[in-house]
Amino acid sequence: MSTEPEVNLKLAQEHGLNEEEYAKICEILGRTPSFTELGIYSVMWSEHCSYKNSIAVLKTLPRDGASLLTQAGEENAGLVDIGDNLAVAFKIESHNHPSAVEPYQGAATGVGGIHRDIFTMGARPVASLDSLRFGSPRDPRVRYLVDGVVRGIGDYGNSFGVPTVGGEIYFEDCYTGNPLVNVMSVGLVEHHKTVSATAWGKGNPVLIVGSSTGRDGIHGATFASEDLSEASEDKRPSVQVGDPFAEKLLLEATLEAIATGAVVGLQDMGAAGLTSSTSEMSARGIEKTGSGGIEIDLDLTPAREKGMTAYELMLSESQERMLIVAEKGREHEIIDVYKKWDVSAVVIGQVTDDNMLRVRHHGEVVAEIPATSLVLGGGAPVYIREAVEKKPDTPAADLVADDSLDFKALSLQLLSRPNIASKAWVYQQYDSMVQTNTVTPAGQTDAAVIRIKGTKKGLAMKTDCNSRYVYLNPKAGGAIAVAECARNIACTGAKPLAVTNCLNFGNPYKPEVYFQFKSAVEGIGDACRMFDTPITGGNVSFYNETSLGGGRTAIYPTPTIGMIGLLDNIDNLVESTFRKAGDAIVLLGAPELSLDGSEYLVMQYGTPGTDSPAVDLNHEKNLQELLVTLASKKLINSAHDVSDGGLAVTLAEKSIMNRERMLGFEVDLECSCKEGTAIQKQLFSEAQGRVVISVDPGRVGAVIEEADRLNIPGRVIGKVTPEGASIAVNGKPVAEFMIDELLHAYGHALESALHLEEL
């Protein structure tokens, strides 16, 4: 220990700890911490691991539900009962800062890490989704980031053998230097095969399994807990390096090891590596049984590089590693399974009953820390920051009169916007059909759906967030993120079940950012309570800022929602696109129309306006129930919600998103409003709570009857045609298209915007 640097306040501050936190550490230990102990505390008390600036707010979210098998934060991921002795494990997490400095590996290891969280619970990953944000595609650096992130996600997922079935991608200037890479994994497990991330049972051996430990990723958790800057490029060593083929072996070996019954507890080594897995598993054991702890000997840890210090071994975030607590006397069964798969499994310590995390290296005790003092809910600090509302300084749009506009040209221009245009270039790089459970190709249903083999059921899943709405109105925007996710799932015929979230915000020490965070969480909570979709867990990513106009600017607040839903009978699945000519087109929902927050307003007037669209959560809940009922009774042939771009874009997407079955439409919108901008609002408003369905003409009466029962306005606005597309308002044509015109505008605009030929 004498070779370690002298620990003092200055060194602690260099590790991201403040004076008060350093004093608390000294008080807990009753002495000055060793250098290794300082490193352990610095990562465990970082924002990334401790949630110290967010946990007080997160505790206000609904976390109870009849179908939940674990509460938020109890385990590596949420666990939801779906009947037939099956449960869904699912979670979403961010890998933003690593992807900003090393996009390929940053994104790839984000995929690997979230899948490990799922299979360490005993579940087999069956699908993944993503939610991505980048700056303007005009920026060469942004194009480099997009290319690296998309390839990283695709290469890791394809090699690992889990389909990437859905996601979203948006472009806004505020993400130029700070992209967001949020990845969600979904897995299935039989109830009796689940595993807890808990260390208990004095004398039970502790094993490290998987890849050897190197110097990659050291202080990755701390890196994720600070602002990005030009100097962040120097922190490429903080970005881990992934190996999907090693993870595939680790997956199969782990599920087989669990089947032996010899595994007591299991946790992924993600952020903070060996430090977080030992301390968190110890703390859970203490909480559940009253005593626990772990003692390890780092000399037994397989190291990738010579001369690694205790500090480096404890803080390394080398990928494809896990910590296992085995039943004493049966560890050889686990080791034999991993050996069969050519995966390392080594006993490095044991469970104790003195409530300590004890680390030995070269015959010395280099760390001896009360385990609960390290973790969220234990000794880790909790802060409530100042929150001050700061209204966006975006001007209201000065709308021009409808009669001066070319609505055909505007509609085609809107379809070619990167935020709306086809994302085929992205999802064609992902294998969405591996495992043969995916029901429809990407983009043909409002939420991805996979079949649950051995049953008639389907599992729907979606990620959603319109960050612009949250920027304009954090509370309403947070609620809309949940509402649209649930609406998308209900459009497939599935009932929304539960939520995981990934909360991406700026610096929490800035009062206006903390206000955005608190308000968005309040909106999310309101929506989840209304829909009975509890929060099962997730991730908070602060310190997301970019350099714009010579200063530091926070990203748009982006509380990404990941949601799952259950389709009782896969035969009742409803697709997004028109199914057959002659069907009636019905618009469900009739909110007051506004252009605030819309893509059209940004495109045409250079401002998002002054507020988000309004959201009526009671209406949304009834709309979800209606859609599920209509699907179960087979009364509708398609359903697609009205969102980005408004009704004109929704109709176009229903026409062209299925390239093998493109159909047209004739729509006539009734409008009693006499104002001179009514047509713009009819076509391009992103007012919430609306869905366009197509229905056999003979079933329209039954559909309207069901809608009336739930107080959902519904009216026929047109019909599906074999070819051509037209929109009229009050009988007056305002836009007519050939299907090929819609497809040309929508189909390859993203590739053109990204100048892919230059990559």
From Swiss-Prot:
Keywords: ATP-binding, Cytoplasm, Ligase, Magnesium, Metal-binding, Nucleotide-binding, Purine biosynthesis. The keyword Cell inner membrane does not apply. It is found in: Cytoplasm. It holds the Pfam family AIRS. Pathway: Purine metabolism; IMP biosynthesis via de novo pathway; 5-amino-1-(5-phospho-D-ribosyl)imidazole from N(2)-formyl-N(1)-(5-phospho-D-ribosyl)glycinamide: step 1/2. GO terms for cellular component: cytoplasm. It catalyses: N(2)-formyl-N(1)-(5-phospho-beta-D-ribosyl)glycinamide + L-glutamine + ATP + H2O = 2-formamido-N(1)-(5-O-phospho-beta-D-ribosyl)acetamidine + L-glutamate + ADP + phosphate + H(+). Mg(2+) 2 binds at residues 117, 268. The active site is at residues 48, 95. Substrate binds at residues 94-97, 116, 240, 317-319, 541. The keyword Ligase applies. InterPro entries: PRibForGlyAmidine_synth_PurL, PurL_linker, PurM-like_C_dom, PurM-like_C_sf, PurM-like_N, PurM-like_N_sf. GO terms for biological process: 'de novo' IMP biosynthetic process. Mg(2+) 1 binds at residues 93, 539. GO terms for molecular function: ATP binding; magnesium ion binding; phosphoribosylformylglycinamidine synthase activity. ATP binds at residues 51, 91, 501, 538. CDD domains: PurL_repeat1 (cd02203), PurL_repeat2 (cd02204). Belongs to the FGAMS family. Monomer. Part of the FGAM synthase complex composed of 1 PurL, 1 PurQ and 2 PurS subunits. Part of the phosphoribosylformylglycinamidine synthase complex involved in the purines biosynthetic pathway. Catalyzes the ATP-dependent conversion of formylglycinamide ribonucleotide (FGAR) and glutamine to yield formylglycinamidine ribonucleotide (FGAM) and glutamate. The FGAM synthase complex is composed of three subunits. PurQ produces an ammonia molecule by converting glutamine to glutamate. PurL transfers the ammonia molecule to FGAR to form FGAM in an ATP-dependent manner. This is Phosphoribosylformylglycinamidine synthase subunit PurL. It comes from Chlorobaculum tepidum (strain ATCC 49652 / DSM 12025 / NBRC 103806 / TLS). The gene is purL.
